[in-house]
């Protein structure tokens, strides 16, 4: 079965964040045009991401890949997220993502004019519910600093970069066994590009997108 056919016959895979009917055919045409320009990032469309998530039945694996898709986080940023970074009960649910540099300096003061963290709104209610269920069913883990004795919260996902890549590879292979094939090679960074393109399709201003992506320079977003 082709991927468009798979999505068409799976209503649950339709993206809940789309405010208007998603023109999948037009989006595919635009992406096909972009493929001729090798400097442009490779990305999946929202229904394709949903199809891939379908092949991640493990709860924690699904939640992590869904986090990459819903936040645009780099993999190292997502793997550093702690439970306290998720604010799921606020009027506007959001996650606070710390930069790698800020994590290395243990939360020290950032340079003047620069923000150490970025706040990403979580606009998909299904994803927010998924994270609530995950936190309700698992215990938060802590570690003690050997030098100071300070008790610190550990990341939600205690796995390596390679492990996450293996999860994705297995999901892609499972999809292929069902005849569902993706037009690009899928990696953790694919979801960051997909997040950005999804917001652009939703007419989010590039300056806002720049902030959500954590890019210091607009050229990085462009």
State the predicted function of each range:
Residues 1-32, 74-76, 170:
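N-terminal DNA-binding recognition helix of tyrosine site-specific recombinases/integrases
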Residues 21-50, 105-125, 142:
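DNA breakage-rejoining catalytic core of tyrosine-based enzymes
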Residues 30-35, 120-170:
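Major-groove DNA-contacting interfaces characterized by cationic-aromatic clusters
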Residues 46-75:
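Basic, Lys/Arg- and aromatic-enriched nucleic-acid-binding interface segment
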Residues 68-91, 207-208:
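Short, charged phosphate-coordinating catalytic segments
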Residues 81-131:
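Conserved tyrosine-mediated DNA breakage-rejoining catalytic core shared by Y-recombinases
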Residues 86-90, 185, 204-222:
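Short, polar N-cap/turn motifs at the start of nucleic acid-interacting alpha helices
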Residues 143-146, 166-211:
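Short, basic (Lys/Arg/His-rich) helix/loop patches that form interaction surfaces
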């Amino acid at each position: 079965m082709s991927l468009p056919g798979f999505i068409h016959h799976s209503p649950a895979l339709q993206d809940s964040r789309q405010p208007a009917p998603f023109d999948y055919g037009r989006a595919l045409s635009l992406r096909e045009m972009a493929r001729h320009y090798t400097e442009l990032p490779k990305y999946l469309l929202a229904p394709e991401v949903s199809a891939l998530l379908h092949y991640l039945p493990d709860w924690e694996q699904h939640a992590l890949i869904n986090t990459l898709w819903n936040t645009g986080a780099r993999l190292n940023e997502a793997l550093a997220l702690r439970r306290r970074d998720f604010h799921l009960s606020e009027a506007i649910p959001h996650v606070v993502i710390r930069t790698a540099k800020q994590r290395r300096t243990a939360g020290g003061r950032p340079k003047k004019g620069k923000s150490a963290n970025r706040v990403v709104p979580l606009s998909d209610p299904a994803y927010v519910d998924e994270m609530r269920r995950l936190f309700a069913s698992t215990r938060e883990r802590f570690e003690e600093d050997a030098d100071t004795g300070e008790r610190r919260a550990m990341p939600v996902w205690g796995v390596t970069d390679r492990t996450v890549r293996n999860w994705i590879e297995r999901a892609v292979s499972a999809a292929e066994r069902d005849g569902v094939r993706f037009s690009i090679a899928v990696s953790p960074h694919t979801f960051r590009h997909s997040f950005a393109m999804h917001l652009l399709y939703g007419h989010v201003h590039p300056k806002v997108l720049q902030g959500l992506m954590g890019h210091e320079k607009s050229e990085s977003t462009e």
